[in-house]
A protein has these predicted regions:
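Outer-membrane beta-barrel proteins and related beta-barrel translocases across Gram-negative bacteria
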Residues: 1-194
Length: 194
């Protein structure tokens, strides 16, 4: 089943400090028309997240904790999904061209109420780890592994090529779904400097 996002518009805020404190807030929202087989309709969502300036563990090693709230509105059946979440992320430079990361994410949701199969929250507790290698000043590749913390199984592996296009970033990703046949390619352009 192919998923179509027709005319989706997404806005992400910058990260803003809360007063003069080290705590930060950011948000994002999107609206678009989604179609997956016979399930189709307008989708709207927003997300707010609070965090803090990264804690420097050593020269190139940082730790960050975060928490937030996401809410989705589905025009197909008028359902609403509310999802508080929290997590932690560690990042480090292994060398001048190599970075590594590990993060834990927990989505506090009792059941998935999205009418779209591709939009389901399959892993309420996940560990993501990986690394990237800088090929040139504008290009890098990365591998990221998503592990289900409920049973310990590897859920999927993402192979990504990233290119800095000056005002945009391009990401070409292959998702190896590991245990099922839901492998897929995805290309994404993200505007910056706007």
């Amino acid at each position: 089943v192919w998923v179509e996002k027709i005319g989706e518009l997404r806005l992400d805020t910058h990260t803003y400090h809360i007063g003069k404190s080290p705590f930060t807030a950011r948000g994002e929202t999107s609206i678009g028309y989604w179609k997956e087989g016979s399930v189709k309709g307008v989708h709207k969502d927003y997300k707010v997240e609070v965090s803090h300036d990264p804690i420097n563990l050593w020269k190139d090693g940082t730790l960050r904790f975060f928490g937030g709230y996401q809410r989705d509105y589905y025009g197909y059946d008028k359902s609403i999904r509310s999802m508080p979440y929290w997590g932690a992320q560690f990042r480090t430079a292994v060398g001048p061209r190599v970075n590594a990361w590990v993060s834990y994410n927990q989505r506090n949701i009792n059941y998935n109420n999205s009418p779209y199969r591709f939009d389901s929250t399959e892993l309420p507790k996940e560990l993501i780890y990986g690394g990237s290698f800088k090929l040139t000043r504008l290009d890098d590749i990365s591998v990221s592994v998503k592990q289900n913390m409920m049973n310990g199984d590897v859920d999927s592996i993402y192979y990504t090529y990233h290119r800095d296009l000056h005002s945009f970033d391009m990401y070409l990703t292959y998702k190896d779904s590991h245990k099922n046949n839901n492998n897929q390619w995805k290309i994404k352009f993200v505007g910056k400097d706007f």
